[in-house]
Amino acid sequence: MIQAGDFRKGTTFEMDGDVWQIIDFQHVKPGKGAAFVRTKIRSVMTGSNRDMTFNPNEKYEEARIETREMQYLYNDGTLYYFMDPDSYEQLPIDKASVEEAILYIKENDMATIKFFKGKAFQVSPPNFVELEITQTEPGIKGNTATGATKPATVETGATVNVPLFVNEGDKIKIDTRTGEYLSRV
């Protein structure tokens, strides 16, 4: 059991026959009245979001989430296929569960997949990835005195702001949590 006062970002719990994940939370202690926890939660099963307030003393059953590393194989337009590297079992995952993580995952890359009762509900790329730039404007020398950036499209289709000295064909390192350029590889 977990108390609402112990909610943190990423916490998963069961409520009303569904599994919910905390997206954002705020502990509120007003001058008058009782304290409460204001949250934004997402249904693990349906993907719908809700804003809820909880009494910090309310208790909920903590959801048991399984995490596995799997290899991304391909997509057929509607489903994304991942493979367990130990058993070679292939797992199709719908587009809603993959969300924006696929912008940082190439074919044959590893990804972290979260499961609840055998159903995949979230795909996460590694924290840092190296991708090749497929399209960007050429940087013009003398354009600026400070570190200016320009948009660049990488091989997976994601758009990243990069420094002016980065060109097409360069490999760059990206922080997938923020989507920011880190360095040239």
Swiss-Prot record:
It is found in: Cytoplasm. GO terms for molecular function: translation elongation factor activity. The keyword rRNA processing does not apply. The keyword 4Fe-4S does not apply. Pathway: Protein biosynthesis; polypeptide chain elongation. One of its GO terms (cellular component) is cytoplasm. It comes from the Bacteria. This is Elongation factor P. GO terms for biological process: peptide biosynthetic process. SUPFAM superfamilies: Nucleic acid-binding proteins, Translation proteins SH3-like domain. Pfam families: EFP, EFP_N, Elong-fact-P_C. Keywords: Cytoplasm, Elongation factor, Protein biosynthesis. Involved in peptide bond synthesis. Stimulates efficient translation and peptide-bond synthesis on native or reconstituted 70S ribosomes in vitro. Probably functions indirectly by altering the affinity of the ribosome for aminoacyl-tRNA, thus increasing their reactivity as acceptors for peptidyl transferase. InterPro entries: Elong-fact-P_C (IPR015365), NA-bd_OB-fold (IPR012340), Rib_uL2_dom2 (IPR014722), Transl_elong_fac_P/YeiP (IPR020599), Transl_elong_KOW-like (IPR013185), Transl_elong_P/YeiP_cen (IPR001059), Transl_elong_P/YeiP_CS (IPR013852), Transl_elongation_fac_P (IPR011768). The lineage of its organism: Bacteria, Bacillati, Bacillota, Tissierellia, Tissierellales. Belongs to the elongation factor P family.
